[in-house]
Amino acid sequence: MEPNIALIASLIGDQARSKMLTALMCGKALTATELALEADITAQTASSHLTKLVEGELLVVRKQGRHKYFQLKDHQVAELLEQLLTLSAAHSSATNSSTTNLSTSGASLKQSTGPAD
């Protein structure tokens, strides 16, 4: 069976799921309710997302009494998320820098293209 990068990317790429995965980076196991709060979604929506993450083998679930606790499957998942967070932060910095440079050069352009006397 060939690796399916697109599947993993789509699982991580959803904003609610990425928030839940990021919340689990602390190493603790959290309930669906706790993860729903982290992702700012309903418990029902969180349950659907968590099922996808478990089926996609990014999370494991364990029962303790009547509660289910979710945690990252292993260190490889944590390392992948850490790399994506680093890449995302670098990309955000580069994008903000480019936007600032464009805004500054646009302001200079407006100043230098005034009407001729």
State where each predicted segment sits.
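N-terminal helix-turn-helix DNA-binding core of bacterial DNA-binding proteins
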Residues: P3-T42, K68-K73
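Alpha-helical residues within the helix-turn-helix
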Residues: L37, V54-E55
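Key DNA-contact positions within bacterial/archaeal DNA-binding proteins
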Residues: Q44, T51
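N-terminal functional module detector in eukaryotic proteins
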Residues: H49, Q64-R66
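Terminal, regulation- and interaction-focused segments at domain boundaries
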Residues: A107-D117
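Conserved segment of winged-helix/HTH DNA-binding domains
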Residues: P3, C26, Y69-L109
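Beta-hairpin "wing" of winged helix-turn-helix
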Residues: E55-Q64, Q71
